[in-house]
A protein has these predicted regions:
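PLP-dependent amino-acid enzyme catalytic core
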Residues: 1-306
């Protein structure tokens, strides 16, 4: 018999897709590959870190079956945590600004999570403060803390990186990904460089908010990257180069992925593929790899995207 033991067994082992039509569109002399992360159970790469963080916390006895998982989040990590918590029989309480989309709230409540809406004007800092206050007053509560928890990057070191290396038989020349929590770029790059030191690793941030490369914070439209600060999880030791991508190009390439490759992905996927194309224009006969972190369905209400 061949079957999976619930949610956690479904996470990872996503396909690596060659973007051949985009290669032809731009007359590239390199091969572009992308890790198709929408194939994770809730449709994003964040399922990997949600699984790693909660399973490790259970193993270390930092949490138990009566623990309340508390996380301030507005995006994919929250959805992943709610799903993993449900599969493990844990209660989740998610704090998010009231400005966040109704779709995301409904996804989390579908997994049995409790949603606490905070003042939209206070943004994520307000949600973080409210979550910490709640946790301080709630016995046996646990904040996963995706920006600070090293199990975040460990998930990618243990799974995503090895999957990429295996699927290309070790023939990886360039890897690039956006800076969100820093877990994806840190974990994957660390693994790849341990196998092959001369792999070029590139981190991507919004042109309008180049915090890592220039120390400048600003508003941008690339959801999922550009947190506005340097996360503790991000280890630049494993990043050779930092580049910026304009929000408009991220939008354009998210549309291009759908219309040329039939891959319906989110905004950060567009940013990653735009930069992969730009790098490919400067090289020949190289394997360039990036990630497509989530699906486009979560961004249907974003004006001007699709």
């Amino acid at each position: 018999m061949n079957y999976k033991h619930g949610f956690v067994d479904l996470v990872g082992s996503t396909p690596l897709v060659r973007l051949e039509r985009i290669e032809k569109e731009f007359h590239l002399k390199c091969r572009l590959f992308a890790k198709y992360e929408r194939n994770n159970p809730t449709g994003s790469i964040k399922d990997r870190i949600a699984k790693e963080i909660l399973l490790n916390a259970l193993e270390r006895k930092e949490i138990n079956q009566d623990t309340v998982i508390v996380e301030p989040t507005s995006g994919n990590t929250g959805i992943g945590l709610c799903a993993v918590a449900a599969s493990l029989g844990l209660k989740a309480v998610i704090f998010m600004p009231s400005s966040m989309s109704v779709e995301r709230r409904k996804m989390m409540t579908a997994f049995g999570a409790e949603i606490v809406l905070t003042d939209a004007k206070a943004g994520m800092p307000g949600a973080i403060a409210a979550a910490k206050e709640f946790a301080s007053k709630t016995p046996n509560s646990y904040i996963p803390g995706q920006f600070d928890n090293l199990d975040n990057s460990l998930a990618h070191y243990k799974t995503t990186g090895p999957e990429i290396y295996r699927d290309l038989d070790g023939n990886v020349d360039v890897f690039l990904a956006g800076f969100g929590t820093g877990g994806t770029i840190t974990g994957i790059s660390r693994y790849l460089k341990e196998q092959k030191k001369d792999i070029l690793t590139i981190g991507i941030e919004p042109e309008e908010s180049p915090v890592i490369s220039k120390g400048v914070k600003g508003p941008h439209k690339i959801q999922g990257i550009g947190a506005g600060f340097k996360p503790a999880v991000l280890d630049l030791t494993y990043v050779d180069k930092v580049v910026t991508v304009p929000s408009e190009k991220a939008y354009e390439f998210a549309r291009l992925l759908a219309r040329k490759e039939g891959l319906f992905c989110g905004i950060s996927s567009g940013a990653n593929v735009y930069e992969a194309v730009e790098i490919a224009k400067t090289m020949e006969d190289k394997n360039i790899v990036t990630v497509l972190p989530d699906n486009g369905e979560r961004y249907l209400s974003v004006e001007g995207l699709f």
